[in-house]
Amino acid sequence: MNFAKKDLTDRCACCTIVREKQKGLKHMTVKAVIWDLDGTLLNTLEDLAASTNAALEACGMPTRTIDEVRRFVGNGIGKLMERAVPQGRENLLFQKAYDAFVAHYGAHSRDHTRPYDGVMEMLDKLSAKGVKLAIVSNKIDFAVKELSRDYFPGRMQVAVGDDPSRRRKPAPDSVLEAMRQMGVTREETVYVGDSDVDVETARNAGVTCCAVSWGFRSVQCLKDAGATRIAATPEELLAMLEAL
């Protein structure tokens, strides 16, 4: 038996299999994509609104509509409750409302929360291209890590949340920390989010920004913040990332 010939045949067959698997996967220059969480990967609005209103009701305060809560989110729980509570932090019951929100959301944060349609498929296609993926959120750090693990198992290399050692978004600290952990440069990184805060975060971090309009902010809000790349669907975002 000609073993040299057999080895060459096996290698050619292996190469054919690899080529077939890679067929249709466009080469990407982007090495890492960092994602905002709420309104970008996960639709958390219904649970956030329910917990906000449970906290307000517990303090005898008027409740908020889901559209109001949509406008309030994006800067962490403190800002959400500051905007939802009448007179904000000046209200003597603010801390009680804040604590009530934390307790309710801790027990009900996953009642209705789900990934947006098409997100999982998009993440899997990016992973297949060798792109590193990370989450950066203003949610508390341990919650971000739990949500990353539970909703996106095996997909995220890094998950970074709010921590006393770092400034929260729109400061670049969390994005830069995620980049450090992944070992990528600014030129290799894209940040994706659904809000004006995310657009500013990407600008402050010195990375390319792709905004999405399926989340908590309008297209006009994103444009006003300076977004020049806005995707309406995960499929459109994938094509946008491939073109960079």
Regions found by a protein language model. Name each.
Residues 2, 15-17, 24:
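Short, positively charged and aromatic/hydrophobic N-terminal segments
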Residues 190-231:
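Acidic, Mg2+-coordinating phosphoryl-transfer loop and its flanking beta/alpha structural elements
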Residues 74-107, 117, 124-125:
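A metal-dependent, Asp-based hydrolase signature
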Residues 152-159, 222-241:
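Structural recognition of alpha->loop->beta junctions
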Residues 28-71:
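Active-site neighborhood of HAD-like aspartate-dependent phosphohydrolases
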Residues 57-59, 63, 80-88, 112, ...:
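Substrate-recognition/cap helix-loop segment adjacent to the acidic, metal-dependent catalytic center
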